[in-house]
Regions:
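Right-handed parallel beta-helix
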Residues: 156-201, 206
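Acidic Asp/Glu-based divalent-cation binding sites
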Residues: 91-92, 164-165, 173-176, 193-195, ...
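Generic recognition of long tandem-repeat/solenoid scaffolds
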Residues: 73, 121-129, 264-272
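Acidic/histidine-rich helix-loop elements
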Residues: 133-135
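A mature extracytoplasmic/lumenal domain signature
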Residues: 89, 98, 109, 120, ...
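Short, surface-exposed interaction patches in beta-rich subdomains
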Residues: 181, 197-293
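Active-site alpha-helical segments that house and flank conserved acidic catalytic motifs
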Residues: 83-85, 169, 188, 248
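Short linear S-[DN]-x-LW-Φ motif typified by the pepsin-like aspartic protease active-site region
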Residues: 2-126, 137, 141-167, 175-178, ...
Length: 293
């Protein structure tokens, strides 16, 4: 004869609920661990592919520098204490090879495809328009040449979608490459496309990835704040894990800090190492990986 749930004593009902909850929790955590491993594997594969694409971009850039006649705009340092770079179509490259006291923005493409001007002490560079005009289908590459020891007060690197439903892929997606970038603060906003910064030296780092991919390698003297929606962020920082205190939020995505994984957190996880610096990591369904060297 079948029993009813109400026939179970309160004591046994309590333990029954406890066992069911434990079973569900174990299943969820097992599933989240599997998902985390899958995301981590896909994350590594994606960045391997991204690395190859950046290498191809680098070769293309050097070929263009060798072959092209460039359009140039030159600014003295007092008009470029800050840099605001936004790429909606094509590629932008920051290199530290300019003469002293001069910052040069150049491209072999017509200046109708890119724009540069100084507003007070901020240099503003835009590649590609907000809409897909016919000439925007050309893959524009611009170069920002900076003096070897120059340190910006603040740098903003943004890759954005254009205002329509055109598909963005590795062939036409926006990308920024920066080597040896120095700034009091670096902000990276990857709505789409990709940003790679290597050999950087900054006082503070902020990264926001929507569906874009971000690679950052370098030294950060202060706090790090990283948010990732469905994109991917990879940080390779000078120093050690213990140099930071941590605030970690992760839903369905994957966060890895120096080999330790975090996923499916029901609430924010705080780690206090008694450090002078703080790292905030917030991931929705994407992936964040932090390594130290």
């Amino acid at each position: 004869m079948g029993g009813r749930l109400s026939d179970v004593s309160a004591y046994h009902y309590s333990w029954l609920g406890h066992d069911i909850a434990d079973g569900i929790t174990r299943d969820i955590r097992s599933g989240m661990d599997d998902l985390s491993r899958d995301l981590s594997d896909n994350f590594d594969d994606s960045f391997d592919e991204l690395g190859r694409e950046f290498d191809d971009i680098g070769r293309s850039i050097h070929d263009r520098l060798d072959d092209g006649v460039l359009n140039e705009s030159t600014f003295s340092e007092i008009y470029a204490r800050k840099l605001d770079l936004e790429v909606r179509r094509g590629k932008a490259v920051i290199v530290y090879d300019a003469p002293a006291d001069k910052i040069v923005v150049s491209s072999e493409e017509d200046m109708a495809l890119w724009n540069v001007y100084s507003e007070e002490d901020e240099l503003k560079v835009t590649v590609g328009s907000k809409s897909w005009d016919s000439h925007d289908y050309k893959d524009t590459v611009i170069y920002i040449h900076v003096p070897a020891d120059y340190r910006f007060e603040k740098v903003e690197l943004k890759v954005k979608a254009q205002s329509n439903n055109k598909i963005i892929n590795s062939d036409n997606g926006p990308a920024i490459v920066a080597e040896g970038l120095k700034a009091g603060k670096i902000e990276i906003d990857a709505s789409v496309g990709a940003v790679r910064v290597t050999g950087a030296d900054t006082g503070k780092l902020e990264v926001d990835s929507d569906v874009g991919a971000v690679q950052f390698e370098g030294k950060v003297d202060g706090d790090v704040d990283t948010e990732c929606s469905v994109g991917a962020v990879k940080l390779d920082l000078a120093g050690a894990k213990a140099d930071f205190n941590y605030e970690i939020k992760c839903k369905v995505g994957s966060i890895t800090v120096d080999g330790e994984g975090f996923s499916g957190l029901s609430r924010e996880k705080k780690i206090n190492n008694g450090a002078a610096k703080k790292m905030e990591l917030d991931c929705n369904t994407g992936a964040i990986e932090v390594k130290f060297h």
